[in-house]
Amino acid sequence: MAVSLSAFAKKVSWIDFVKNLIVITFANLIGALFVAYFFGHFVGLTHSGIFRDDVIRIAQSKVASPFMPSFVSGIGCNWFVGLALWLSYGAKDAAGKIVGVWFPIMIFVAIGFQHSIANCFVIPAAIFEGGVTWGDFINNLIPVYLGNIVGGSIFVSGFYYFSYKFGH
């Protein structure tokens, strides 16, 4: 979101924006896969019982969503994540930052919006337990990821940039 705002303001190129997206995405994917496998599957947290059942149920629900609803869900999700970041940036102290981040994140989770990086944990966790496939994961990741980009880059950074640029 910060890099897209910089791209709108021509402080960085759109090529740099895309490069940043690629690096950040793969770093988050590797971290999420590591946590899902080692702390979920290997340690056994998602290997049996209620945690296994829940992670599979959640993942199956996410991968069952068609392309357009997943895309729109991704937009809504990252719109709330972007709002959380802006509220955090504007807060004067740690308590304000916590409150500013807590409510938008709580709302997107309660609504059931999809975030590509959160899905990079929960869907592979279900894959490691036999609940869904890697193909299901990729088919979910593409629309959610694209929606997250639109939600954060256009609905947060773009709206902020253009309202400030033309509002003053």
Predicted segments with their positions:
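Alpha-helical transmembrane segments and their helix-helix packing motifs
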Residues: 1-168
